[in-house]
Design a protein with these regions (language model features):
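Asparagine-centered strand-capping/turn motif at beta-strand->loop junctions
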Residues: 289-294
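Short, hydrophobic/aromatic beta-strand segments
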Residues: 296-303
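Accessory "access/gating" subregions that flank catalytic or transport cores
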Residues: 17-38, 47-57, 66-71, 85-179
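Catalytic cores of secreted or luminal carbohydrate-active enzymes
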Residues: 223-272
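Intrinsically disordered, low-complexity Pro/Gly/Ser/Thr-rich segments with frequent PxxP/GP/PP motifs
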Residues: 308-336
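Terminal connector regions
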Residues: 335-375
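Short, solvent-exposed loop/linker segments at the N-terminal edge
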Residues: 275-282
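Catalytic phosphate/nucleotide-handling subdomain of diverse soluble enzymes
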Residues: 84, 156-237
């Protein structure tokens, strides 16, 4: 869905699209060739989605945001999306920004740059009254030539929240004045404060009433009113609270109006335990999991590709009704003078009465380089 609906933007989104078209799935869809943008704000800006549909379920919100983030990012960005999703979910019951930050730090690896940055910014905000000085400290230690880099921008956002005094206008203007990725810094801070204040307070304090919005994604909405978007967010939230395993139902009443397409009877997923890149005379192994929720036994096979030898981990892969199985595919690249960048394979399972399920996956042919020099 993310691939189909997301507009064809550059940066990390473009690298995700290219990797997905190569058959590469998360987490490597957010890693391969994405060195410059992998730590960008493209996924932390999506964190509010998970926090708002899972009020007071911060660990689940953080977990889902991690899945979301690995589509097109890696490492620091994903950590900070988890951190922000936790804060948003927790903000349904806590309004103190310092408390929210401290609680959300629990999902950050303590040896990560993300944890260090959050700790630094909160300490600097306690030590210094001048937000411009704090901004210079953030740039000095975490500044990056990519204006969307998450470390500097989440640092700015935290500073603005801590120094904005809960005033959504002051905080938003400060975030914009800080520069860099301002739609994200003002957006993240504004969404969190808006949640804490609520629609009634926004109108009373600032005269902010229902308004319209614009999006660049490819889908149709019943309207472009923020109130309708909020209403639909609540509906999705009720559905998650009612149906997601382990979710604590924090909202009473309300009708679950979300109808999802039926789950497929057979689900196949592939996992890369090693990078999905291959060269001549090399081999890699791809792991698969399959769930058969049908009433029929299914059996599977593998389609190969020129220049490759492919082997299943067993001579025959059969999965009984209402059961699951795991298997492996070993891909050997023959000795060759050239290798395509995009190499798509397919695992297909079939059962009686026309039951079929297929999973396409890819490996990337490593590039060959010819080095000249050195020259004096």
């Amino acid at each position: 869905v993310f691939y189909e609906k997301n507009i064809k933007w550059p940066g990390e989104y473009a690298y995700f699209r290219k990797n997905y078209e190569r058959g590469i799935r998360p987490p490597y869809s957010g890693i391969y060739e994405n060195d410059f943008y992998r730590d960008g704000m493209g996924c932390p800006i999506r964190a509010e989605i998970w926090g708002m549909i899972l009020p007071l379920n911060p660990l689940i919100a953080a977990s889902l945001s991690e899945i979301d983030g690995t589509l097109d990012h890696f490492g620091t960005s994903v950590y900070l999306e988890k951190f922000w999703a936790y804060m948003v979910s927790e903000a349904f019951g806590e309004s103190d920004i310092s408390v929210l930050i401290e609680r959300a730090k629990s999902v950050l690896p303590q040896d990560s740059a993300a944890f260090e940055m959050v700790s630094d910014v909160t300490r600097w905000c306690e030590e210094f009254s001048d937000e411009k000085k704090i901004r210079s400290y953030i740039i000095g230690k975490y500044g990056h030539c990519d204006c969307t880099n998450a470390l500097q921008n989440i640092g700015f956002t935290l500073c603005c929240l801590l120094k904005g005094g809960g005033d959504i206008i002051k905080t938003g203007v400060m975030a914009c004045d800080f520069g860099f990725d301002t739609d994200c810094t003002a957006g993240n801070s504004g969404a969190l404060l808006g949640l804490i204040l609520g629609a009634k307070k926004l109108k009373e304090l600032y005269g902010i009433d229902d308004c319209r919005y614009k999006v660049t994604l490819k889908y149709e909405r019943r309207s472009d009113l923020v109130s309708d978007l909020a209403d639909d967010t609540v509906k999705v939230g009720l559905h998650f609270l009612n149906n997601f395993a382990g979710a604590v139902k924090t909202v009473d009443g309300g009708k679950d109006e979300i109808t999802l397409p039926p789950e497929p009877l057979v689900k196949i997923a592939n996992y890369y335990d090693e990078p999905p890149y291959i060269a001549s005379d090399e081999k890699i192994t791809v792991r698969f999991g399959i769930e058969n929720n049908s009433e029929k036994t299914i059996a599977g096979g593998l389609s190969g590709k020129e220049n490759f030898e492919c082997k299943l981990s067993a001579a025959k892969i059969a999965v009984e009704p209402k059961s699951a199985a795991e298997f492996f595919v070993e891909i050997n690249c023959k000795r060759t003078e050239w290798l395509a960048d995009k190499n798509i394979f397919a695992v297909k399972f079939e059962g009686k009465s026309g039951l079929t399920a297929e999973r396409k996956f890819g490996v990337i042919g490593k590039r060959r380089y010819l080095v000249y020099g050195p020259f004096w």
